[in-house]
C-alpha cells in the first residue's frame, strides 16, 4: 500500500531498519537525482532505495508568542528540558519511544502513578521514582533502579506492565544534538528552556534566539539516510519530500545494495574484519582537521584496526573563554607545576598523594566550635602528609572520617592538627618544585586535577598549540575510540577519532598486508566548548559519588550563656528550622587510624559540603511490603550510627559538579540572552 514519505517516517521504528522502498510517485528535475545543500530534493518513479538510518536534521521551535524559528541541531546553546506532560501508558510504550542505553544521558527517570507488585514482598509504591537502565528485547523486560534508596534497589518490569508512568523533571543541561540523539520520543514534541546562549562571536547562531523569552516547543524534522541501488553514495532525503513509497523489504535482498559504513560502524566491526581497503565517499559533506586533510586527499585508504587511545583532557586557565585540549600520552613537551587552589578541606584530602607532601597557606579564617578540631586563620601554613587516609575506629569498626589530620607550621615548630572536612575556607598551594615533567609522569605521580605550564615545547610538532597557553588545568584521563588509518603506500599513518570525525567509507576488499608494529605519533586536538561539556558530562556520570556529610550531632557543643528570653526564642525557632550540616564533635577517647589509601584497601571519601535544600528523611513504616520497607529494614541495625544520613538526589550532585566545573553557565534565564 502506497503512503507518503512523511507517513512512512513517522510510523517506522529504528529497530526495524534497514527497509527497502519503491518510489511510486516521484518528483524530479533534469534527471534522476538533483541535490540542493547535500539533500536529495527529487526521486524518480521506480527508484529502489535502502533506508539505513533516520536522523533529526533540525527543529522547528515555536515560541510563546507563536513565532516559529528553525534551529539546526548544530546550534551551540545549552537547554534545559521540561518534563513531558503526557504520561506513558505502559512500559512497552516507553521502550518503543525512547532510546535507552548504558550512558546516563540515555537512562530516563519516571514516576509511577500506581502501585506495582514486582515480586513477593516487593511493591513499587505510587509516586516512587525509578530509572530505566537497560532494555532486554529478547525477554520483553526493562531493568530499573529505584531512586532515593541506598544501597540502590534494582528490579525489572515487563513490557506489558501498565502505568501510567510520568517523566520526572531533568535538571541537566543538553545541547540540541544530545536532545536529538537521546531525548526526543518518537511521535512527540519537546518543551525546552535555553539556559546558555551562544557566544557573541558566533555570528552564525548568536542572533537566532536573541529576543526570545520563555519555553520553546521543539518539533523534530527528520531526514532519511538511504542508498540507491545504482549508486555508491549516501542520499540524505528530507522526510517531507512530496513522494509516495511502498515498503518492499520482503521482496528484495538488502545485501544486494552497496553498504557504506560510517566511522562508528567501522569501529564496531569485529577484529577479523580488519585490515580492509576502503574508498572514501566523494559525496560526503564533512569537515576535517588539517592533520587529516592530507591523508584523505587520496580517495582510497587502509583501515588497520580500531582501538581506544588514552587522552588527557586539559583546559586553558584564563579569565575569558578558555580553550580545551585533548593531549596524547606521546606528547614530548615538558611542564612545570603551577599552584593549585583548594576551596575546602575535603579538596585537600582528595589531593593527598603518595609521592609528596602538599604545602598550602590558608586564605580565609575559620573558627571551630568543636573540641579537638583546629581553627584556621588566613596566612597560616599547613602540610598535608603523603599517602595516608584517615579513618576513625569505633568499637573496632572503621567509619568514614569527618576530619583529617595535617600539620600546622609554626615559628617554633610543627604541630599536628585536625581540620573538619566541611571547612569552607580556602587554601593556596605553595609550589617549590622546579622539576620539569612529561604529561605521562604527571598522570602517574599526581592525583588529578593538576595545574601546569608548558616549559619546553614539543619540538617534533610543527606548531605546538599548548606552548602559547598561560597555564593548563589538567582535568582527567579519558579513553577515546579511534581507528588507525593510513594511505595505500603506508607512508602516512593517523589516529582518527571516531566521535569527532564524520566520514563515510565504502569497503572494497580485505587488505592482505601487515599492519605496522610501531607506535603512531598522535596530534594534540583542540575541541569545542560543546564537545568539552559532553566529555565532562559523560565522564562525571561514571564517577562514584563520595559519602554524604554528617548530620547535626546528637550532642551539640556547649553554647555561650543567654538570657532566658532569648533562650526561649531560640528554642522555638530551632524546632521548626531546617536541618543544617554540622561536623560530628571529635571525641578524645576515639582512636584515629591512618590506613594506606593506595594498597587496595577500601577508601571512603566524604563529600565536599555545598549549601543545598535538603529533602526530608523518608520514615520507615512499622510493617509493609514496599521497597521502602525493605530498604529501611536492611539498615535498621545501623540507626545508631553517628552518621545519620539523608538522601541527596543525583540531580543535585550533578548541580554541585556543574557549579565547580561549568562556572560560566548561568542557570537562571535572562530575557536578554536566554528564553
UniProtKB/Swiss-Prot annotation:
Its main location: cytoplasm. Residues 1-252 are annotated as: CABIT 1. This is Protein THEMIS. Plays a central role in late thymocyte development by controlling both positive and negative T-cell selection. Required to sustain and/or integrate signals required for proper lineage commitment and maturation of T-cells. Regulates T-cell development through T-cell antigen receptor (TCR) signaling and in particular through the regulation of calcium influx and phosphorylation of Erk. It comes from the Eukaryota. GO terms for cellular component: cytoplasm; nucleus. Residues 253-510 are annotated as: CABIT 2. Belongs to the themis family. InterPro entries: CABIT_dom (IPR025946), THEMIS (IPR039671). Residues 566-577 have a biased composition (Low complexity). Keywords: Adaptive immunity, Cytoplasm, Developmental protein, Immunity, Nucleus. GO terms for biological process: adaptive immune response; negative T cell selection; positive T cell selection; T cell receptor signaling pathway.
Amino acid at each position: 500500500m502506497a503512503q507518503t514519505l512523511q507517513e512512512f517516517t513517522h510510523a517506522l521504528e529504528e529497530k526495524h531498519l534497514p527497509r527497502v522502498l519503491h518510489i511510486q510517485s516521484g518528483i524530479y528535475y533534469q534527471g534522476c537525482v538533483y541535490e540542493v545543500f547535500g539533500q536529495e530534493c527529487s526521486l524518480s518513479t521506480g527508484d529502489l532505495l535502502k533506508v539505513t538510518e533516520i536522523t533529526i536534521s533540525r527543529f522547528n521551535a515555536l515560541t510563546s508568542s507563536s513565532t516559529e524559528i528553525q534551529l539546526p541541531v548544530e546550534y551551540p546553546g545549552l537547554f534545559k528540558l521540561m518534563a513531558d506532560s503526557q504520561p506513558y501508558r505502559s512500559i512497552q510504550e516507553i521502550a518503543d519511544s525512547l532510546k535507552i542505553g548504558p550512558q546516563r544521558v540515555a537512562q530516563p527517570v519516571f514516576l509511577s502513578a500506581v502501585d506495582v507488585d514486582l515480586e513477593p514482598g516487593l511493591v513499587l509504591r505510587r509516586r516512587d521514582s525509578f530509572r530505566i537502565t537497560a532494555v532486554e528485547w529478547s525477554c520483553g523486560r526493562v531493568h530499573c533502579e529505584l531512586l532515593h534508596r541506598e544501597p540502590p534497589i534494582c528490579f525489572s518490569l515487563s513490557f506489558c506492565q501498565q502505568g501510567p508512568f510520568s517523566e520526572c523533571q531533568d535538571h541537566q543541561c543538553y545541547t540540541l544534538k544530545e536532545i536529538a540523539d537521546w531525548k526526543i520520543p518518537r511521535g512527540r514534541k519537546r518543551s525546552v528552556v535555553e539556559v546558555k546562549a551562544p557566544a557573541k562571536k558566533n555570528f552564525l547562531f548568536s542572533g537566532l534566539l536573541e529576543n526570545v523569552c520563555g519555553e520553546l516547543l521543539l518539533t523534530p524534522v527528520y531526514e532519511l539516510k538511504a542508498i540507491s541501488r545504482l549508486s555508491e553514495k549516501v542520499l540524505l532525503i528530507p522526510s517531507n519530500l512530496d513522494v509516495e513509497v511502498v515498503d518492499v523489504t520482503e521482496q528484495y535482498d538488502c545485501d544486494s545494495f552497496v553498504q557504506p559504513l560510517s566511522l562508528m560502524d567501522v569501529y564496531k566491526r569485529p577484529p577479523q574484519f580488519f585490515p580492509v581497503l576502503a574508498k572514501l565517499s566523494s559525496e560526503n559533506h564533512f569537515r576535517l582537521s588539517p592533520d587529516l586533510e592530507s591523508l584523505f586527499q587520496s580517495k582510497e585508504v587502509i583501515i588497520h584496526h580500531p582501538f581506544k587511545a588514552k587522552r588527557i583532557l586539559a583546559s586553558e586557565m584564563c579569565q575569558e573563554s578558555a580553550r580545551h585540549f585533548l593531549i596524547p600520552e606521546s606528547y614530548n613537551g615538558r611542564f612545570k607545576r603551577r599552584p593549585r587552589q583548594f576551596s575546602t578541606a575535603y579538596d585537600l584530602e582528595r589531593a593527598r598523594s603518595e609521592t609528596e607532601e602538599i604545602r598550602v597557606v590558608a586564605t580565609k579564617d575559620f573558627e571551630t566550635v568543636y573540641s579537638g578540631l583546629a581553627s584556621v586563620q588566613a596566612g597560616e601554613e599547613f602540610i598535608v602528609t603523603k599517602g595516608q587516609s584517615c579513618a576513625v575506629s569505633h568499637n573496632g569498626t572503621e567509619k568514614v572520617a569527618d576530619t583529617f589530620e595535617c600539620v600546622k607550621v609554626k615559628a617554633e615548630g610543627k604541630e599536628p592538627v585536625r581540620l573538619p572536612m566541611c571547612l569552607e575556607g580556602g587554601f593556596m598551594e605553595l609550589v617549590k618544585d622546579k622539576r620539569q615533567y612529561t604529561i605521562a609522569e604527571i598522570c602517574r605521580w599526581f592525583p588529578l586535577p593538576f595545574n601546569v605550564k608548558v616549559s619546553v615545547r614539543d619540538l617534533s610538532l610543527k606548531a605546538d598549540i599548548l606552548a602559547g597557553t598561560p597555564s593548563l588545568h589538567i582535568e582527567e584521563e579519558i579513553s577515546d575510540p579511534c581507528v588507525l588509518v593510513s594511505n595505500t603506500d603506508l607512508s602516512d599513518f593517523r589516529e582518527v577519532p571516531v566521535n569527532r570525525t564524520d566520514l563515510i567509507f565504502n569497503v572494497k576488499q580485505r587488505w592482505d598486508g601487515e599492519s605496522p608494529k610501531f607506535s603512531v605519533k598522535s596530534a594534540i586536538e583542540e575541541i569545542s566548548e560543546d564537545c568539552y561539556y559532553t566529555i565532562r558530562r559523560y565522564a562525571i556520570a561514571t564517577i562514584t559519588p563520595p559519602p554524604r556529610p554528617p548530620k547535626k550531632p546528637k550532642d551539640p557543643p556547649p553554647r555561650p550563656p543567654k538570657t532566658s528570653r532569648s533562650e526561649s526564642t531560640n528554642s522555638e525557632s530551632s524546632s521548626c528550622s531546617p536541618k543544617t550540616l554540622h561536623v560530628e564533635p571529635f571525641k578524645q577517647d576515639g582512636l584515629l587510624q591512618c590506613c594506606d589509601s593506595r594498597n587496595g584497601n577500601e577508601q571512603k571519601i566524604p563529600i565536599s559540603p555545598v549549601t543545598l535544600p535538603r529533602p526530608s528523611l523518608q520514615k520507615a513504616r512499622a510493617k509493609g511490603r514496599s521497597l521502602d520497607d525493605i530498604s529501611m529494614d536492611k539498615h535498621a541495625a545501623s540507626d545508631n550510627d553517628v552518621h545519620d544520613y539523608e538522601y541527596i538526589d543525583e540531580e543535585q550532585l550533578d548541580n554541585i559538579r556543574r557549579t565547580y566545573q561549568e562556572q560560566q553557565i548561568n542557570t537562571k534565564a535572562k530575557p536578554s540572552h536566554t528564553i
